[in-house]
């Protein structure tokens, strides 16, 4: 399969999506941040001096989805219909799993917006708690599901 982001001279280009059909596009991405018990408890008990960590991560994730095309060179700017973020507490492993669901009606998908949303949300948690635990790890950022468009649906293997 040829790379569509290269022209005949192998130079970068942005793919022309002008002839594509506008359809509903949905993408769901996820990722996890793991930390020590002290940092986890500080977040849960609202004891982080920088403020409400999980609420701030949700707002940052929404902003990340909206700014994706400004940071990913070949990503088209598209109007988003919605961004929903859920953060699950994983007490046993002192982790949080962040899910971002992005929806649009456009000529291109929102996979990158969902992945960016997760990444920025998790990085925000790291930033707000790094004074307590610098050894936090972000892992497993992945596309869980996508629907719409010419390539059809995708579901990650569990």
Swiss-Prot record:
Family statement drawn from the similarity comment of this UniProt entry: Belongs to the MoaC family.
HAMAP family given in the database record: MoaC_B (MF_01224_B)
Protein name, per record: Cyclic pyranopterin monophosphate synthase
Residues that bind substrate: 74-76, 112-113
Catalysed conversion reaction: (8S)-3',8-cyclo-7,8-dihydroguanosine 5'-triphosphate = cyclic pyranopterin phosphate + diphosphate
SUPFAM superfamilies for this protein: Molybdenum cofactor biosynthesis protein C, MoaC
PANTHER family per the UniProt record, alphabetical: MOLYBDOPTERIN COFACTOR SYNTHESIS PROTEIN A
Molecular function GO labels: cyclic pyranopterin monophosphate synthase activity
Keywords of the record: Lyase, Molybdenum cofactor biosynthesis
Active-site positions on this chain: 127
Subunit structure: Homohexamer; trimer of dimers.
Pfam family for this entry, one: MoaC
Naturally occurring in which organism (per UniProt): Helicobacter pylori (strain HPAG1)
Lyase is among the record's keywords: yes
EC number: 4.6.1.17
